Design a protein with these regions (language model features):
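Flexible active-site lid/hinge loop adjacent to a nucleotide/diphosphate
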Residues: 1-60, 65-72
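Adenine nucleotide phosphate-binding catalytic loops in nucleotide-utilizing enzymes
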Residues: 16-23, 55-167
């Protein structure tokens, strides 16, 4: 299971009026996870959910390469997905059992608009972390990310770019 964030855009629905209430609802996903719980280390409300899972492992996702908790988790052999700066831009990198696996430059993922759409960089990182946790091979994850786009046909109404229009 994975929880990307707890933000106010979902408040006011079905009696959920505070971020703490929303975090409690979203935490159910982590409570029932068996194999791996994938959590956003950059979101304090999501990070707290790590104490509520019996999953076999936890994978932290961070866009902050020097995140102290994630660094300690990786040093202890834990799984993580981190964004790292490199000579060609930002690299999505996986860590597991002491291994360091550079995955893909963010500018090569179409939905990230050459790495500028950071929300889709984060979405791609979570997709990669989940896929890796399910045993998907790195080359298959790379191929999936290279085809992650926001065209009208793949994701209607979600950041679609139309170059053909005169405006």
């Amino acid at each position: 299971g994975a929880v990307l964030n707890v933000q106010s855009d979902h408040l006011g629905l079905k009696g959920i009026d505070t971020l703490d209430q929303l975090a409690e609802v979203k935490r159910v996903v982590i409570e029932v996870a068996k194999d791996c719980a994938v959590l956003n280390a950059d979101d304090p409300l999501t990070l707290r959910m790590s104490g509520y899972t019996d999953a076999a492992s936890i994978c932290y996702v961070t866009m902050t390469p020097q995140h102290q908790l994630v660094r300690e988790h990786v040093r202890a052999g834990g799984r993580a997905c981190a964004l790292e700066a490199g000579v060609n831009g930002q690299m999505i990198t996986l860590y597991d059992k002491g291994g360091h696996m550079p995955l893909l430059w963010t500018h090569l993922i179409p939905a990230t608009l050459e790495g500028r759409a950071t929300h889709n960089v984060q979405n791609a990182m979570f997709a990669a972390a989940l896929a890796f946790s399910l045993g998907i091979k790195l080359d298959a994850i790379r191929q999936g990310l290279r085809t992650f786009d926001t065209t009208f046909y793949q994701a209607p109404g979600r950041m679609n770019v139309f170059d053909e229009h005169p405006f």
